[in-house]
Amino acid sequence: MQTTLGPRVRTRFAPSPTGYLHVGGLRTALYNYLYAKKVGGDFIVRIEDTDQARKVEGADQSLLKTLEESGIVADESILHGGNFGPYMQSERLDTYAQYCRQLLDQNNAYYCFSTAEELDENRKLQMKQGIQPKYNRKWLPETMGGNMPQSEIQKKLDEGAPYVIRMKVPDYISIMFEDIVRGPVEFDSATVDDQVLMKSDGFPTYHFASVIDDHLMEITHIIRGEEWLSSMPKHLLLYEFFGWEAPRFAHLPLLLNPDRSKLSKRQGDVAVEDFIAKGYSPDAILNFVALLGWNEGEGSEQEIYSLEELVQKFSLERVGKAGAVFNIDKLDWIEKQYIKARPVDQIIQAIKPLLQKELAEKSTDMDVARISSDEYLTQVIDLMRERVNFENEFITFSNYFYFDPETYDEAAVAKRWQDDTNEVLAEFITELEESDDFSADNIEAMLKAFVAPKGKKPAFLIHPLRILSSGVGFGPSLYHMLEVLGKQTVIRRLKKGIERVTV
């Protein structure tokens, strides 16, 4: 069967609006986008909402929003329009009915009046007999090689009995195609069921509508998950029934858990929106999913890619057949690299709304104008960039830069406090109050000079100073942290702390 089309590449991502965007869906969308953009082609997003029972209101807009937040902007969609619309399948029902009528007239499809109970009974019987469940063709008309008289079919139609329309799969033929990822693939039509094309509610099935739309929208390459490979015989037969040239197909490897089981929505958070809500950035997520099945090739150690680099370097020939393991540790590492490299102004733009929300919900003893300033936030970012895992942690994990601690790490206090700690701290607070230089270097020099005559090591004060200033026993360089917090804030916190912490 011929599977090549004209020179302009057109790919599509066709999600169902049944919920959030699965990470596997993001990968499919990305690979379609990259393949089209690399050669100057078009990327289309089509909403496949033929299953009205599972349709979630607003999910179509949410899917497109998530894609665009990740940098994947469609050339044609329900948002952007285009010359091949509508891009919502529920708005194309007349088109599907027209092509279904053509298949009926050609004896490539037939009416089926079997009830759900009959179908279930037939399926159970076949399974008991060890036969692969398939429709038993009870309603296949005599004119198509079946046993049902046309008069019986017409009688049911006249009575207004509910029906579906099924395709007639040819008997005992070989169905072959060349998959871009998997190479030659062959099916025996004897294993293929007479697929339902039109449901009793007048809506087409995915299999029928997608073939019609892919042809009418001039899609040249269909890049989708491996789970659709078993549907290929039905799709290729439909192209043949209509006399249409089929696009080229590429079936991507499954996404797997570390234990090699299939990554599933039922196993927890696998929606892109869930990862974004946890603090992962869209560009890091996109980079991560790009590597789930694709690699640049031997000799390349690069793992961090911009979208522009991916467009330049991506090829379906470098997509593997084996399942791709979804390793959350790898995503964490990629996110960390993005935070390290992200310009300060971008981080400030992202975290300012979070800080403003915190300040609106909670009072602070610090100067709000100062801690909200770009200058102050830049200092916090420079100090914490190596320590945070997500952008929002510049606020949440670094809370003590904006609010005085309400509690102190009890384990750290128990470990670091001695009988005379508060007494020595009080003396050092006086030293700090009298100093006009609150730079990190001077604070360090003062501390070392202060403890030496007392026969103590710097650590005697370093840890208590950190705990009383931040509430926790770990963090960035103490001296730089104190400098960023500022003299007024540090002295206030230390005085408050020695009143509250006792051994």
From Swiss-Prot:
Top-rank EC class of the record's enzyme: ligase
EC number: 6.1.1.17
Gene Ontology MF: a single term: zinc ion binding
Listed InterPro entries: aa-tRNA-synth_I_cd-bd, aa-tRNA-synth_I_codon-bd_sub2, aa-tRNA-synth_I_CS, aa_tRNA-synth_I_cd-bd_sf, Glu-tRNA-ligase_bac/mito, Glu-tRNA-synth_I_codon-bd_sub1, Glu/Gln-tRNA-synth, Glu/Gln-tRNA-synth_Ib_cat-dom
Family annotation (Pfam families): Anticodon_2, tRNA-synt_1c
Reaction(s) the record says it catalyses: tRNA(Glu) + L-glutamate + ATP = L-glutamyl-tRNA(Glu) + AMP + diphosphate
Keywords from the named record: Aminoacyl-tRNA synthetase, ATP-binding, Cytoplasm, Ligase, Nucleotide-binding, Protein biosynthesis
Protein family according to the UniProt entry: Belongs to the class-I aminoacyl-tRNA synthetase family. Glutamate--tRNA ligase type 1 subfamily.
PANTHER family referenced in this protein's UniProt entry, alphabetically: GLUTAMATE--TRNA LIGASE, GLUTAMATE--TRNA LIGASE, MITOCHONDRIAL-RELATED
Protein name from the UniProt record: Glutamate--tRNA ligase
Organism: Prosthecochloris aestuarii (strain DSM 271 / SK 413)
Organism lineage string: Bacteria, Pseudomonadati, Chlorobiota, Chlorobiia, Chlorobiales
